[in-house]
């Protein structure tokens, strides 16, 4: 009969109407989210429009296959923008080619500030820093940054493939990525992944992606630093999320992992500093001691011995019942 509506047609219309209402509701939620995020975009663009006061030089860095780069701090002091307090004071310090330098100290002692200045995320308030005798400000900024592979404590991984996370690029050398992952202790995990380095991390964009632990994330970040193959490697608490066995493995293979690179190693665990050539001890924004583990431990009034003793007491087996 003309104008009649069968049961099947009615159900189709009802389903379509319900889908339409759901879609309108979702559209409303998206519109609300966009409206709420506009204020954050405004702040973001305000940040991008801030003028930079850093001087960008034009001298290209020397491309040396032997990795012979020396960096030296010359009476460097630094205050963060908007602060009257010096985070670092009168730092004079030289890093030699191929040296492994551990940087230790309590929170707020100036360790991370020193690293930020080393990588030229900031410029010194006073004093200057040289690379092979030339003020780092005179070098091309991009060339200078290319000399450093850095793993900060607050590193981030992305919901891309494992290979893209290690190489920081869409196109990468799969074999080299695998080698770096094996060096960082991810070899067994990599072997278990169904798609190898093409396996997605997390499930945000790929339902077949894998969830990783904090320790695995730290190993991937270390592999990322190795893949860049820069002459300077900066590691800020690189084993903080690892279990004791994995951490011991990293220490045992440290020289094999970093090769002939110059390494700056920041750690609160003083036991991890023993494999380094030299230890720099910071306290209240100043470099107060430098030397080997044995040399610093022999200084009974030194800050390093104080820190070492404070940590060692928790690892000493007591005979008390």
Regions found by a protein language model. Give the residues of each.
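Cytosolic ends of transmembrane helices, especially the final helix of ABC transmembrane type-1 domains
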Residues: 13, 19-49
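Ca2+-coordinating acidic residues in Ca2+-binding motifs
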Residues: 9, 43, 143
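Conserved E/DxxT/N motif and adjacent residues on the DHp alpha2 helix
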Residues: 46, 53, 167
């Amino acid at each position: 009969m003309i104008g009649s509506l069968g049961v099947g047609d009615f159900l189709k219309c009802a389903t379509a109407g319900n889908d339409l209402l759901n879609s309108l509701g979702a559209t409303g939620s998206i519109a609300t989210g966009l409206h709420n995020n506009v204020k954050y975009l405004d702040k973001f663009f305000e940040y991008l429009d801030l003028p930079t006061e850093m001087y960008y030089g034009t001298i290209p860095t020397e491309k040396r296959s032997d990795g012979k780069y020396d960096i030296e701090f010359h009476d460097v002091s630094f205050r963060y923008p908007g602060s009257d307090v010096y985070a670092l004071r009168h730092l004079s310090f030289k890093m030699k080619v191929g040296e492994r330098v551990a940087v230790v100290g309590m929170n707020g002692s100036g360790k991370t500030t020193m690293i930020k200045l080393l990588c030229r995320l900031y410029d010194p308030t006073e004093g200057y820093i040289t690379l092979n005798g030339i003020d780092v400000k005179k070098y091309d900024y991009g060339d200078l940054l290319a000399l450093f592979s850095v793993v900060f404590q607050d590193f981030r991984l992305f919901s891309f493939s494992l290979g893209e996370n290690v190489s920081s690029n869409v196109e990468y050398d799969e074999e080299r990525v695998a080698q770096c992952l094996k060096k960082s202790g991810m070899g067994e995990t990599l072997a278990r992944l169904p798609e190898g380095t093409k396996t997605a991390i997390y499930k945000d964009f790929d339902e077949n992606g894998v969830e990783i632990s904090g320790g695995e994330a730290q190993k991937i970040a270390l592999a990322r630093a190795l893949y860049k193959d820069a002459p300077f490697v900066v590691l800020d608490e690189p084993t903080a999320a690892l279990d004791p066995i994995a951490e011991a493995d990293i220490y045992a293979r440290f020289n094999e992992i970093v090769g002939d690179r110059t390494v700056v190693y920041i750690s609160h665990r003083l036991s991890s500093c023993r494999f380094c050539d030299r230890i720099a001890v910071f306290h209240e924004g100043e470099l107060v001691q430098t030397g080997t583990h044995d040399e610093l431990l022999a200084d009974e009034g030194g800050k390093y011995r104080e820190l070492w003793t404070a940590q060692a007491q928790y690892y000493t087996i007591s005979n008390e019942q």
